Amino acid sequence: MTEAHFIPSQYTQTLEKGQLSWEAPSNIALVKYWGKYGEQLPKNASVSFTLQNCNTKTSLLFEEKDSDGFDFEVYLDGKRESSFEPKIQKFFERVFVYLPFLKDYKFKIETSNSFPHSSGIASSASGMSALA
């Protein structure tokens, strides 16, 4: 299979609005990679443990819109976190060729962790995993 197999030719069904939720475990690195290259690839390998009781729950609320472009807001524990939005924007741009409907909807991304944010546990990894 090649990447072309994952590019849809067209969608035959659409949804007006809806909500999806997912939960993903976090991890903590014992040996952390240092730096990235290319398309966000690590320069060296890392070793980490999955933390079964530390997870991120993300809900994606969506509704159709008429305007062009990506339209979304990110909330952490009920508060708007615009600082998270550039990472989501980049993710949407990278997957758009496979998910062209992303520009047809306005998204509200609500996320929360079962552990403190910025505590050394990989919340961005579990958050992106739950979103994907």
Show the residue positions of the predicted features.
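ATP-binding N-lobe of GHMP and related small-molecule kinases
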Residues: 1-119
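DPxDG-like acidic metal-binding loop motif
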Residues: 121-132
